[in-house]
């Protein structure tokens, strides 16, 4: 199935995943965890997926220095030069810009798919066909492409893409991007039929994204473009360590996709989910007749419904009379909170960090 040596994949794997605390922590973020007991972490599943359509030697992992050993342990088939290690976190635009310069040094004709490391894809065959079709689209045009997912509910945790006129077989010009709307607006979006979820998956030719960075993110370009003679060499890491921390902290959505006038979307339904929250994990997990989820743990549940329980496999959870709760334990932390209040988890993480600092 893998044929085109000009096709590359960049997997972004440097996030902390604080919304999945206490399981996902700075020392072991969610992309390195196996949530469903498959024997493969989210990162490994993402790699397994893309190596079916991208030459394995053309797959890059961009992550933080902290996770170098984790990536090497989970993906031992990668060569050291396929793992790009950021000295500090600077959001997705600098991450993608660096990977683009690196790839351009290897292959100035490269077509690139950029993907997060924590997505779940249930309809893999349809997804991979869309990736190949999208890479072909960007190889023949100076356009930036994203994948749009048909929404099945008014989700407030995703960004939305409004489509304009068609530009070929299932490709549409993007009219607007909207970041994580309130519930009422999300309902309007879904009912209109014009809006699709923003998957966070992108495709483009390497020269197209470099030109977009030059035009829309000149401050970022000024930090990374001077390294064009060292990308792909042994001097690259030193250059990045010295210059990457000075890059602006900006997302690819805000910095490029919302501002460029050559953005298109390919629409699909791949059984896609951004596994970003406990709520999304609950939605995807098998449930008992009362809507309770118990992941990889023993449980006795009475008079309760719509809960998610995630404990170490040597613990037994006995639950009576709860509705709509998250019960999660990892290491020395037990978290119990309303499932629909999980947006406060980042506050708990900050409070825990402050307690440790003061203590």
Please provide the spans of the model-predicted regions.
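Conserved core of the sugar-phosphate nucleotidyltransferase
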Residues: 124-244, 264, 314, 355
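Residue-level signal for inorganic ion chemistry
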Residues: 43, 99, 118, 161, ...
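A residue-level structural signature of the nucleotidyltransferase/glycosyltransferase Rossmann-like core
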Residues: 112, 194, 201-202, 273, ...
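Short beta-strand segments
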Residues: 11-13, 62, 113-116, 146-150, ...
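Conserved N-terminal catalytic core of the sugar/cofactor nucleotidyltransferase
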Residues: 1-11, 19-26, 37-116, 122-132
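Left-handed beta-helix
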Residues: 1-6, 207-357
């Amino acid at each position: 199935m893998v044929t085109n040596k000009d096709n590359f994949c960049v997997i972004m794997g440097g996030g902390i995943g604080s919304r999945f605390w206490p399981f996902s922590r700075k020392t072991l973020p969610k992309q390195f965890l196996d949530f469903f007991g498959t024997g493969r972490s989210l990162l490994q599943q993402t790699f397994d997926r893309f190596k079916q359509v991208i030459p394995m030697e053309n797959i890059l992992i961009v992550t933080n220095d902290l996770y170098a050993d984790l990536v090497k342990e989970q993906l031992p088939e990668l060569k050291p030069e396929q793992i790009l290690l950021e000295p500090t976190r600077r959001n997705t635009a600098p991450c993608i810009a660096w990977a683009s310069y690196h790839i351009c040094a290897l292959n100035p004709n490269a077509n690139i798919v950029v993907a997060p490391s924590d997505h779940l894809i249930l309809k893999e065959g349809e997804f991979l066909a869309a990736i190949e079709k999208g890479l072909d689209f960007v190889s023949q045009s100076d356009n930036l492409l994203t994948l749009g997912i048909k929404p099945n509910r008014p989700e407030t945790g995703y960004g939305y893409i409004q489509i304009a006129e068609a530009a070929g077989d299932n490709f549409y010009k993007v009219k607007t991007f909207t970041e994580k709307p309130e519930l009422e607006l999300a309902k309007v979006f879904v009912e209109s039929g014009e809006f699709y979820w923003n998957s966070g998956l992108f495709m483009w030719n390497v020269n197209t994204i470099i030109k977009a960075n030059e035009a829309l993110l000149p401050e970022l370009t000024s930090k990374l473009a001077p390294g064009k003679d060292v990308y792909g060499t042994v001097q690259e890491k030193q250059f990045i360590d010295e210059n990457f921390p000075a890059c602006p902290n900006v997302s690819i959505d805000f910095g490029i996709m919302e501002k460029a006038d050559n953005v298109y979307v390919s629409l699909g339904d791949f059984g896609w989910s951004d596994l970003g929250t406990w709520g999304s994990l609950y939605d995807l997990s098998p449930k008992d007749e009362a809507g309770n989820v118990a992941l990889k743990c023993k449980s006795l549940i009475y008079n309760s419904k719509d809960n998610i329980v995630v404990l170490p496999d040597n613990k037994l959870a006995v639950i009576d009379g709860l509705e709509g709760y998250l019960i999660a334990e990892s290491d020395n932390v037990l978290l119990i909170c309303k499932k629909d209040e999980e947006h406060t988890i980042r506050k708990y993480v900050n409070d825990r960090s402050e307690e440790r600092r003061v203590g």
